[in-house]
Amino acid sequence: MAGTSIRGAARELLESDAVAQVVTLNEDGSPHVTAAWVGVDGDEIVLATIPDQRKLRNLRRDPRIALSVPTTRVNEWGLLEYLVVYGTARVTEGGAPELLQRLAHTYLGPGVVFPPMPNPPPGFVTRITPQRFGGVGPWNPPRGAN
């Protein structure tokens, strides 16, 4: 399924140090929510995991995923801006330490070594293809706005 381009303010937020809330679906249909560092690679959102976690098992079974990414901005109506991304994910083995190191520069600062262990395992990279955007902010103008 073709995705939606990540543009403007949505891209800026996803490339910032805002931590995403990641929602996958458990086998019984209930939501599984975790927090994750995210980045952008072309028109995909990427995140990395070293151990094989529940979110990865959920995504292998059902690739639907949602992210909620808060900002610190309040709009003219007093609402906190946040981005919601609905999409599909694919999990690949390997590359997690390299992606985590790249993201660590954004989230922790330059010169940080992450993961903080010698010879980390290859882990997993999740690549998310956005299908649509929502939330409150310039990526989703309010109804009735010009």
Regions found by a protein language model. Give the residues of each.
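Charged, gly/pro-rich active-site loop segments
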Residues: M1-S5, E76-N146
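Short beta-strand segments
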Residues: A18-P51, L59, L67-P70, E81
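Short, basic/aromatic recognition patches
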Residues: M1-Q21
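Alpha-helix boundary recognition
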Residues: L14-E15, R60-R61, N119
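Short, solvent-exposed coil/turn segments
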Residues: R7, E15, P31-V33, G78, ...
